[in-house]
UniProtKB/Swiss-Prot annotation:
It comes from the Bacteria. HAMAP family: DXP_synth. One of its GO terms (cellular component) is cytosol. Belongs to the transketolase family. DXPS subfamily. It comes from Bacteroides fragilis (strain ATCC 25285 / DSM 2151 / CCUG 4856 / JCM 11019 / LMG 10263 / NCTC 9343 / Onslow / VPI 2553 / EN-2). The keyword Magnesium applies. The keyword Transferase applies. SUPFAM superfamilies: Thiamin diphosphate-binding fold (THDP-binding), TK C-terminal domain-like. Pathway: Metabolic intermediate biosynthesis; 1-deoxy-D-xylulose 5-phosphate biosynthesis; 1-deoxy-D-xylulose 5-phosphate from D-glyceraldehyde 3-phosphate and pyruvate: step 1/1. Binds 1 Mg(2+) ion per subunit. Binds 1 thiamine pyrophosphate per subunit. This is 1-deoxy-D-xylulose-5-phosphate synthase. Transmembrane segments: none annotated.
């Protein structure tokens, strides 16, 4: 291939054992080549970009010093692990990253023994690594080291503090590396972010560290007895200052740093020096997200996952969206601002996703009425509940897959009290290339059993706006609105804000042979499949948009149950426990026995690929729906006695 870069060192590194054959003086060149390889690959094969550039030196140093995969490295979130993948046998396959059948977007033990723990969500690395350290000790593997790499805002998550609290009371050989780049996807927020900044810039603490280091350096001139005495004095001085200014030392976790996270030789030296120190330790690195690529260093949020770009000029290759429908996320943002201008009780809450979910629109217009609470989904829900309890009306926007982490908070802190909290579940359904950790396919199944909770899903942008308007009306109680990532279907998306009666669906099309019941935007695919099937086979299909999973539109379902012997339910969620199950339960409870085919996500974790590819694999695309409808045409004349509810 023309202009293909040549790497004098990286080309010879297939696994970390090859890296460890180099001298420490060669590591900076390895880092430069690895960084350029990441830039080259991601310029044409989009993925998480800036985070991986920021940890190139750390990644190289870790695999150079530690005996991976025997030694364990646990990456928090994992979107910074592209360099790790390239160095661990996947460089040739890296062009398939995030593609159907290719390597996975996040570390996965099923893919490589170097990927020690599944990741994708934040703040779990310390707990997982501590568990591995305990396992190593119990098995007598005294020479096995365990490292947790946490950063990108993950220290704001409660689970990280739970892991620290547990680690502080153990003597296990655990190293926690704090990758401090002041960023999640957006800029980090909260007290921990400010604390780390103060810790990095504290003159008093840094001066004390310098003086203690200088004393210890000179101890080679002293006899053994006096050397030990000065070591004890230095440790005492460090302990005294640390207890006053360092939360980690105060928790009995030895603290080292902060150090330059882009000096690979120094990182390797320090890792080597502290590797065999027993007990929990923290090494604090200060890094720059997007390091080595100017545009990413300047605008890390945009370059978190920028899409395609020119690797030389840094110009992003953005598709022309003129005349296209808007993103559901932007419709949410604009509508929230519109509602908040009229309803002074409305507040906005998001856990570290203001730009991703478009909560930043409200933050920009009314900064005192919107909160980024950091990576803290449980807190976001309970915080919203507290505001609702005293008269405010929070719109709590959390990605569907991340809302799983706040399940008890929804039940205990909102639903039991019937509090007026609007949960906007962004990224509902199959999200595509980010894979099983990010698909929002479980929400309908796990929310449906919760009493007092209204669950809705709009088919299009107009429905989203009207559901948001409905949810903020008085005394609606907990109200969930789920909608997908990406573009809607209406170019003219603005519409009057009107109430939708809670629990009322709608008949989109009449028919006599078969009833199709859908919920959410997948109804658009169903409508096209129905039109094709009717034209090809003559079948007469009625189409109902359920709108609300809870409460169900019982009047609509009685109409369907009385009229139709064949029903197809279609949803963009897990088939176990979802909308199809709700229809089955209703029909059985009310003495209707139609034949029901359910279309949805099967009972398995769906891998990564484009949304269109994944819909096809699950039989949820237009062609899959068409096949189910036309197959039902063959059974239209079956006797009533043979019709039974079927699971599919």
């Amino acid at each position: 291939m023309k202009n293909e870069p040549t790497y004098s060192l990286l080309n010879a590194i297939n696994y970390p054992k090859d890296l460890r054959q180099l001298s420490v003086d060669q590591l900076p060149e390895v880092c430069e080549e690895l960084r350029q390889d990441i830039i080259k690959e991601l310029s044409c094969n989009p993925g998480h970009f800036a985070a991986s550039l920021g940890v190139v030196e750390l990644t190289v140093a870790l695999h150079y010093v530690y005996n991976t995969p025997y030694d364990r490295i646990v990456w928090d979130v994992g979107h910074q692990a592209y360099g790790h993948k390239i160095l661990t046998g996947r460089r040739e396959a890296f062009s398939t990253n995030r593609k159907l059948g290719g390597i996975r977007p996040f570390p996965s033990p099923e893919e490589s023994e170097y990927d020690t723990f599944t990741c994708g969500h934040a703040s779990n690395s310390i707990s997982a690594a501590l568990g591995m350290a305990v396992a190593a000790e119990r098995k007598g593997e005294k020479d096995r080291h365990v490292v947790a790499v946490i950063g990108d805002g993950s220290m704001s998550g409660g689970l990280a503090f739970e892991g620290l609290n547990n680690a502080s009371s153990t003597a296990n050989n655990l190293l926690i590396i704090l990758n401090d780049n002041d960023m999640a996807i957006d800029r980090s927020v909260g007290g921990m972010k400010q604390y780390l900044f103060n810790l990095t810039t504290s003159n008093r603490y840094n001066q004390l560290r310098f003086k203690t280091s200088r004393l210890l350096f000179k101890m080679g001139l002293l006899n053994e007895e006096r050397r030990k005495a000065l070591i004890r004095l230095g440790n005492s001085l460090k302990s005294l200052a640390a207890q006053q200014q360092n939360i980690f030392e105060g928790m009995n976790i030895r603290y080292f740093g902060p150090i330059d996270g882009h000096d690979v030789k120094n990182i390797a030296r320090i890792l080597h020096d502290i590797k065999d120190m027993q007990g929990p330790k923290i090494l604090h690195l200060h890094t720059i997200k997007g390091k080595g690529f100017g545009p990413a260093e300047k605008q890390a949020t945009i370059w978190h996952a920028p899409g395609k770009f020119d690797p030389v000029t840094g110009k992003r290759i953005v598709a022309n969206t003129d005349g296209m429908p808007p993103l559901f996320q932007d419709v949410f943002g604009h509508t929230l601002v519109e509602l908040a201008e009229k309803n002074k009780r409305i507040m906005g809450v998001t856990p570290a996703m203001p730009s991703g979910c478009s909560m930043n629109m409200l933050m920009d217009r009314m900064p005192d009425r919107a909160f980024d609470v950091g990576i803290a989904e449980g807190h976001a829900v309970t915080f919203s509940g507290g505001m609702a309890k005293d008269g405010l009306l929070p719109f709590c926007n959390i990605y569907s897959s991340f809302m799983q982490r706040a399940y008890d908070n929804i039940i205990h802190d909102v639903a039991i009290q019937k509090l007026n909290v609007v949960f906007c579940l962004d990224r509902a359904g199959l999200v595509g290339e980010d894979g099983p950790t990010h698909h929002g396919v479980f929400d309908m199944a796990y929310l449906r059993p919760i009493p007092n909770l209204t669950i809705s899903s709009p088919m299009d942008e107009h429905e989203l706006r009207r559901l948001m308007y409905t949810a903020q009306l008085p005394d609606k109680g907990p109200f969930a609105i789920r909608y997908p990532r990406g573009r809607g279907s209406l170019v003219d998306w603005e519409c009057p804000l009107e109430e939708i009666p809670v629990g009322k669906g709608r008949k989109l099309k009449d028919g006599n042979d078969l009833a199709v019941i859908t919920i959410g935007p997948i109804g658009k695919l169903a409508a096209r499949a129905i039109e094709r099937a009717e034209a090809d086979t003559g079948i007469s299909v009625a189409h109902y948009d359920l709108r609300f999973l809870k409460p169900l539109d019982e009047e609509l379902l009685h109409e369907v149950g009385k009229k139709f012997r064949h029903i197809v339910t279609i949803e963009d969620g897990i088939i176990k426990g979802g909308m199809g199950c709700a229809i089955l339960e209703f029909m059985a409870d009310n003495g209707y026995y139609p034949e029901i085919r359910r279309i949805g996500v099967p009972d398995q974790f769906i891998e990564h690929g484009s949304v269109q590819q994944l819909y096809h694999l699950c039989g949820m695309d237009e062609e899959g729906i068409y096949k189910v409808i036309t197959k039902n045409k063959l059974r239209m004349d079956a006797p009533v006695e043979s019709c039974m509810a079927t699971h599919s």
